[in-house]
A protein has these predicted regions:
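Catalytic alpha/beta active-site cores
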Residues: 1-166
Length: 166
């Protein structure tokens, strides 16, 4: 699209295919590094590329470390950059939490982000309230899917921007 001219790769790395992911990590052994990705709507696709590249490198995915932001609820609240409706988005995230809990227990599947909520105009109290509510929603959905809270909750992280005025 004409509007994308000059914007691709301007904010982060442009990953459009598994070949892009292979190029990104060429010469980097994914088993030896922690990879954090600030990606939300397309997180499942980008994460699948990452896992496939790690497997192609011969990595045991159960030992991989890293974090996905993967906070779709924040997208609905603050950034307005979602792909799927809320219910379907939560199902995808819960499926990813299940996959990582079962196969990649060292990987953080969600970094619940208040930062963007604050940047969208909330007060510090609102940022904290929305972010914790989002975190509770992820936990509730995972438990409804049959995950044991003790197996997945330690892998959740939070990212705040509440400044000194909380």
């Amino acid at each position: 699209h004409d509007m994308s001219i000059g914007e691709v790769g301007h904010c982060g790395v442009s990953i459009s295919s598994i070949k892009d992911m292979e190029r990104l990590f060429d010469g980097i052994n994914l088993a030896d590094v922690s990879v954090s990705m600030t990606i939300n709507g397309p997180a499942a696709i980008i994460f699948a590329f990452y896992v496939a590249v790690a497997e192609k490198q011969g990595a045991d995915i159960s030992t991989l470390n890293g974090t996905l932001q993967n906070d779709i609820l924040k997208e609905f609240i603050a950034q307005k950059e979602w792909i799927y409706p809320p219910h379907e988005s939560m199902r995808i995230i819960t499926d990813m939490m299940t996959f990582c809990t079962e196969r990649m227990p060292k990987y953080n599947t969600i970094s619940v982000s208040g930062y963007h909520i604050r940047e969208a105009g909330s007060t510090a109290v609102q940022e904290l309230a929305f972010t914790l509510a989002d975190g509770f929603s992820y936990v509730e959905h995972a438990m409804e899917a049959g995950l044991d809270v003790d197996n997945f909750a330690p892998r959740l992280s939070f990212f705040f921007n509440s400044h000194l005025d909380f």
